[in-house]
Amino acid sequence: MGRIDTLLGDITQVKADAIVIHDLPTQDPVHEITIIPRGMAGGMTISLPQEDRAYQSRQELEERIAVCLGGRVAEQLVLGDVSTGASSDIQKASAIARAMVTKYGMSEKLGTIAYGNESDEVFIGRTMAQARSYSEEVAGLIDEEVKTIVDRAYARCEEILSQCRKELELTAQYLLVHETMSGAEFSKVFTDPESEEFLALPSAT
C-alpha cells in the first residue's frame, strides 16, 4: 500500500468517526479532527466531555459502539475494501458490547444478570472453560447477544454515513489540505458547506 492509499485510509477512518459522533445525541461534540500521526494512530477525532458522567446509559454505550465502527464502515463505503486499520476500534466495540451483556445486565435475552466476575481470568494451566463460571449454552447466547448489539450499531453507522456522503467528502478535502480541522470548522461542514474556505478546496478524489 502506497503513502497516498495509506493517507486516504487514515482520512476515511478519522472523518467517519467525526461524522458519526455529530449525528448521535449522546456523544460529546467534536473538538478537533487531525490526520497527523500520534503514536500508533494515523490520526484521531478528539471529543471534549460536556459534563462529568459517573454512569453511562444503554443508549450511550450503543452509540459509542457505532462511533467505534465508523472507520470500518467508511472503508467499505468509500474505498470498497477493508483494512487492518480499524482493528483496535473493532476490539473496543466488541468489548463494550460484551460488557453490556455480561456485566451491566443490558441483554434482553439474558436479563439483569452478571455472568462471570472480576476473578474469571485465564491463568497458566487453566483453560477458558475452566475459568468460566457459566455453561456452554449461556456462552453461546452471550456471543449471539454481543453480535446482535454490534450488528445493530454497524447498521446504524452505515445508515448515517450513507446519508452523509457529501459531508464525508468535504471533510476529506479539508483534511487533505490542512491536516487538522477544529470543531468549529467541522460544524460548518453541516451548517455552511458553501463557505469560501470549502469552495476553494480541491477535490479529494
Language-model segments: residues:
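Soluble catalytic regions of large protease machineries
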Residues: 24-205
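Macrodomain-like recognition of ADP-ribose-binding/processing modules
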Residues: 1-23
